[in-house]
Amino acid sequence: MAQTLSKISNKENASSGLRPKRFKPHQPIPTWMVRCEPLDHDSRRGRDPVRASPQAKRVRTPTPYPRHLKPAASAVVRSGNNPSHLKPASTDVVRSGPQPLCCEAKDGGVVRSCKTYNLKPAHESKAVAFSLPKTDGPTGNEPEFIAEACPSCALYDTCPNCTSKVINDDGSTDGTIPSWDQIETTPAFLSLLSNTDEEMSADELTNLAAHLRKAFETGSHPANVDYSKDQLQGLLEMAEAAVPPARRQTLPFYQQRLEARRTWREKIFNQPLEEINKILTTSKDRFQRCAAWKVILEKAVLAKEYGEEAYAYAQQALKNINSFDVNLVLKMAAATFIDHIRMMTVDNPDLVSYIPKLIVKLKPLTLKMIIDNHENTKEGWLVTLTSLAELYGMVEVAIDFVPTVVGKLFDLLMKTTSKMYSMFKSVVLATFTSESLDFTNPFWYAIAAILCFLITGAIPHNGKMKIHKNILSNATGIVAGIKAIQALAAMFSTWSNERLVNDLSSRTIALTELNNPTITADIDAVINLQRLAEVLRDEVKSHTLNPLMQPYNPILRNLMSALDKVISCCTRRKAIATKRTAPVAVILTGPPGCGKTTAAFALAKRLSQQKPSIISLDVDHHDTYTGNEVCIIDEFDSSDKVDYANFVVNMVNTNPMVLNCDLIENKGKTFTSKYVIMTSNTETPVKPTSRRAGAFYRRVMIVDVTNNAVDKWKSDNPGKAVPKWCFNKDFSHLSLSLRGTEPYSKEYVLDPTGRNHQSRRAPPPQQITLEQLAQKMVVQHTTNTSEFVTQAGDVPVFGFVCQNNEIDTVYNLLAAVKARYGANFNLYKGMVRTAHENSGCGAHVHVISREDNFRGKAFTVNRSRLESVPHLEGDSFRRSLGVVMSDKDVTTMFYYIKGKVINDQVSLTELPANQHVVTVHTVYDMAWALRRHLKWSGQWQLIKAAYEIMCYPDTAACALRNWMDSTDFSEEHVVTQFIAPGGTIILESCYGARMWATGQRLIRAGGLTEAGGPQGGVRFAGLGARNVPWSEILREFMTLISHIWSQIKGATVVLTALTFYLKRFRPRVEAKGKNKNKGPRKNTGVALTDDEYNDWKQSKAEKNLDLTVKDFLQLRHRAAMGADNTDAVKFRYWYSKKQKIYHDLENFPIIGRGGLKRELIRKGPLRPRGNDFYDEPDDWYSEGVIDGVTHKNAIVSVDDVDGMHKGYAIHIGHGVYISLKHVLTGNARILSEEPKGITISGELATFRLNNILPTAVPVGTNKPIKDPWGNPVSTDWQFKNYNTTSGNIYGACGSSCSLTRQGDCGLPYVDDHGVVVGLHAGSGGDKCPSRKLIVPYVKVDMRIRDTCTKESPTKTHKPTFSYRGLLGKETGEPRTIMKGTRLHVSPAHVDDYEECTHQPASLGAGDPRCPISLTGIMVNNLQPYTEASPGPDTATLNRVSKMLTSHMEGYVPKVHKTEEDSISAFYMLNHDTLCGPYIGARKKDHVKDGVLDKNLLDLLSSKWNRAKLGLALPHEYALGLKDELRPKDKVAVGKRRLIWGCDVGVSTVCAAAFKRVSESIMANHALGFIQVGINMDGPAVEDLFKRLERPKHDRYCVDYSKWDSTQPPKVTSQSIDILRHFTDKSPIVDSACATLKSNPIGIFNGVAFKVAGGLPSGMPLTSIINSLNHCLMVGSAVVKALEDSGVRVTWNIFDSMDLFTYGDDGVYIVPPLISSVMPKVFANLRQFGLKPTRTDKSDAEITPIPADEPVEFLKRTIVRTENGVRALLDRSSIIRQFYYIKAENTENWTVPPKRIDTPSRGQQLYNACLYASQHGEEFYTSKIVPLIERAVKLEGLHIEVPEFHQAVAAYNGYFNGTEGQPNQIAHASGGLGLSGEVFEN
């Protein structure tokens, strides 16, 4: 069409006063074109005006327009014999000065005047049309009247208005121009409806325009029969939309049409969008509708000025194409009916079986009974419809509209008059009872007109009605009637499609006119215009796939082409103004002929599947550039005339690069390739002295390409062509060397100063292949790409206004509620907003004060009370805050979602809790479930999308995408999980939607019900009546009623219908007497016996549960039936214990306010509550066990003679094994050997084997905690006989989540310490797989001889005694506690030592500061070890242990080899420590010249031999008291720290097992949580500081009191298992694990005390194990706090936070989610038995460390000083170095020592000066310098006092490693201080 219409060369708009574009020389300008006051254009240009020829005699009438055009302009007045459809629209008159009322012009003897042509003066005419631009006449004023008879003559060689006079009303002509019948077959006419390439002359278009003009004037023209005037205008509109804007001037009537749209735009521009939308939906004026579209789109494009709602409205309006086709609906219905009939009859493969199924589904008998019992009353209709809905399972669907339908429909049917029925009957009978069909009745014409209006949207004109009449009149028979109906259907479809195409054309015109830089001036407007054009293009494209639109495809393709031009233009404009991703450029340099160009194309193929674009710099224009992903520039530096350096710099840049192009359509083309490959023959493309050398070499990678085969051939065969064998297809013939950064040659890189470029040698090149080079380029481009664009609507904002002192409380409460309900809102303190409004984000909630100027929905907080977690239900946060919020506001605040987000990557931490789970079998299942998420409009859009997919399956993807973009989601919060065959989809919606899609099966059960959600209904109690508006009370009442009705509506309607039905057959008896209006009394309740009542009361009292009687009976019934859920197992345990202690209860009378009562009082003490493993049930299948089965190295398979597996046996040491009796029945074989000496104890079997496993397990009789796979097990540990498939077995019943199978019998159950206490003997099978039968271990004396040569001091036959709660046993080897101290007062401070904050620890009974004896102090320190701390529950601890192990696997090697001999392991130990309870003195005292003495060697050999068998060693320690400085307050109460001296044999075995693991952990302290091994006086502190500065995270510094004594044994056991995970799991490792997990024994003064809990400070690897314990307990506390708050932890918690742990010192860096529950975390730690405190040991609450305050860790304060990041030692720790000296042992510490080691003392104080220098010059000079000068003088030291700057420089040298650290400063780096024990607190 564009080619055809481009033939039109006449430019329209003579009314604008412009000279026509082209006139023939022999045709002067007609006189009627001259205005009443001459408009002399030519005279202005220096030419004489040309007058018209005298032959022009006919009077030209004004251009008529359709009747719906009502122009509103007031500047130009048209008059004459206007058609009747021209209605006046304005009475405004433009007057520009006194002018004559009329003027005349003589033209060849013919007088032309206003009167001659029947033109009315402006002040009389009301028909105002299109305005003209103002022009200046001779007097400079606008003429008052315009005599314009025909404004179109200047546009054509032969004016269509003039030629229309020779056209008769019937379309015939006088022969000068073709008739209408001939016009319809010309290319001019056909080109308007097709894309033909035939030539169309201007005369043909003129003739067509003449007929269209006549059709507008005369209704009898044949064009009006075939087309309405609206259609005729539509033809021109289609042409206008398809032609480029620059060529639209060539179209007829274009300027008038444009002026009409402009006028309409001015009239409606300021109207609201709703009014403009009415114009789009109701107006039949296409000019008005096109103007409306332009207004809507213009406001959308300028959304920055008119608001984002204008853009959203326009985007939605563009998609609402009214394509509803009644004809297609009828056809789809008929086709569906036929398909169903065919499926039931013809295509059904099993008709015999299908018909019975169909009969069963129809339920004909019941249906017949329902129909027979139907009554024609309202009640009858209700009963019948409800029965039908109940019969076919549609009660819930029909329940909401059945009552309305019954009432209104029944009344409507009853009120229908019989007269109307008889009239309709007579018409039908008159038509169909005759011998032939009679459609001449006007009734059928009315029906046809109504159908036409319903289908096309327009009332048909006379021509269309004539077609209807002709079609219906010819229907004289059945066949003719069918044909007539088909003809009408086809005609209706065509008219409907024409209207759709016209509508699309109007939108396209509006968009193309907006593609103007004067309108879209900024980049935001360009972006909006492009998006709208893309939306409209997708809509047009979707219609091209409609088979019924095939005739209009050429027009639709032209519309798409016009929109593509708009999109491409916007893309170019954006590209010029938008930052782009810099491409990756590489230069291949090398000699000619080596294969660079071929390698470049091969590299391009590896980078992209597209063919590369080619650019040559030898030409100055780049029209041939195609913009593909890879661009190749061959020999880019070959021309000296080209500034190729600047070209490359501009090309490899983030700023857009506009290419120089010659073609107009390529103007503005930018460079868009991702990768640039250039070749060059020069080693240095740009000289290093060039000003652009730095920018050039920084942007490119240079690869030197060499071909050794080619070089050798050329040197050996000069002048000969290189053969092909020098090249290989895999490019192995090339050697690629990648240079470093900024290399201008192979040897040198650029000098940044630019002075001497040969001063910096280049690093050696990297040898690389083409594949590696391609991968490197891809990675580099991915790194460069880092920008994303999101779009969504406005996000709601809420504010809670409170007092300043209440902000933290309100914030914490809202944070807790957010975590409890999985809310989506963003929470802030104050007005500052930190979260980005990306798609999927939630509402913004601010906690603000009354002074803040808040814009949003604000709620005043009347009171603030922080609720506990169990009370966070319903509207608790509203009650706690005293705010009045509607449920709608609560839902919006909690779950609002911005926009639509589709996530392909599923993160379990982001998934919401399900409310509905739907299994998708058909598309109807999904559609039915989606209705919950949608509004009514959204449901209609869903139906429409499904309908389109059914009609056009090819458009499914486009339709679904459009539906997702345009659908309206409900304002309610709904979460649905769709389980489909191909995967799982989770959809969450509330205003917007978030969707997660995965190909895996993901079952997430359970969600927050409406009653338990954050809404829960408003509770008005306590809010005060004045704070609650009446509207809110009424709304809440109606909401409550609706909730109640939604719960009971189904049952209510069914029961009501049943009541109506029963009332039919029930005689009604009138009640009489007193019983009238009364009924029998109904007693409801449960009767209990006295014993049951007592049990119920006792259960409520002991368990503190609010149980009703009904709940109690149901719970008791479930427990009696053997249910294995949590409550039933607990009740069963409680009830059995109650039966055992029944006689410990006594009935006591109690007198109180309520009078005399009797209660059961328990006489015996209540046993402490054990670990409850049911409080936190979890899906243990989600994570694997660390090492499979527990103690797997000591487990061996039991097989039958034929090799069939039967069960397992466990080695308990020295060749003794345990298993089960039914496992050993028959000919059992273990390790190919028969068991010997079998001893049976119940079901347990103990036996011997000659084959001894290298590992053995410890055994005991405690209660099991874990099953064989490490999962928690629940059991009451009560034994009885159970009937099994193998006979009666004596054991206990337990519950575990592990699935067992045949052959698992004999696997071990263990307690907290990993001790085997029972064996697996059976399960509940498929009916109850969680039930397990456990056979307990029974000790059997197998006379196992102890192999240890040194008898343990605790293995004596002396009785056990109790001393102050400690269980002890005499050892017979008394060891006294060392008395006295080595700490003395310095001679410099004999008089003022009391000023020091620390003193030597208490010396015992003779010490006046504290008279407590050393034995008393020792016993007091052992008291906390008598009870084990509870620690976390086993289930949570197991999960966290697996998380920590998984986290550590990232930086700790998996397998560490065990040391093979004891001597090597011994040399791994610190030889300055004691040897333990068996041998005295230090380890180094037993080593001379590298040889161990006999006592030590014998002890190590005996221990090592036992450890090689995997047996546990005696876990014993020598106890002592630490000689150290202590704070005065602790000295006064006798507090000293214990020293646990571990047995040297145990230390050696543990070093062999775990030393290498601990070294790996210490070496990677910068990557992990454990900071053991860190140097706090080195660069490692900077790494800590960087980790502390993690954005949007809170920092907590925590210390703990009595850390060692509060360590739970099961946590220590888990830490040891983690260490074992990273070993080779040898017998030595098993022995070390079993030893360290056993209870420690401390020995002093000849007494051995066995402790129950805690972790000895001298335990091997104590720092590592303490740190692991720290991580495990913090992780368990965090997991428990989150899950108590409603956040299900399904991810590795250690991936979400950072920790610094060194024993009891900890720093926690946590995100906001965890920070919100940190108070609960610390509460959980206290429940575990720990005592967390602040680092200053105060009792204040532990709060986050502000960002501007330093963090304390390891008694250091980490700060940034002018010298860098430093860890400052406490000032008091430095100062007390000067007060005390370590020397000989004494009991009079106030007397200075007799001899001072001056070198060591001088080094100590020198180090103190270095540390003090980091605190600043003032502290150093005023406090430290006087102290050290005094010490030098009075202590006789020989050192020079360093000045401040010297001390700073020395410490910096040690810190940075430029100078070696002295021994003492290196020792202090572990956090203990400069001189070991002196600095310890």
Swiss-Prot record:
Keywords: ATP-binding, Covalent protein-RNA linkage, Host endoplasmic reticulum, Host membrane, Hydrolase, Membrane, Nucleotide-binding, Nucleotidyltransferase, Phosphoprotein, Protease, RNA-directed RNA polymerase, Thiol protease, Transferase, Viral RNA replication. The keyword Nucleotide-binding applies. This is Genome polyprotein. Its EC number is 3.6.1.15, 2.7.7.48, 3.4.22.66. One of its GO terms (molecular function) is ATP hydrolysis activity. Residues 37-50 have a biased composition (Basic and acidic residues). The modification O-(5'-phospho-RNA)-tyrosine is found at residue 1093. Residues 1188-1341 form the Peptidase C24 domain. The active site is at residues 1222, 1243, 1305. It comes from Vesicular exanthema of swine virus serotype A48 (isolate Swine/United States/A48/1948). ATP binds at residues 590-597.
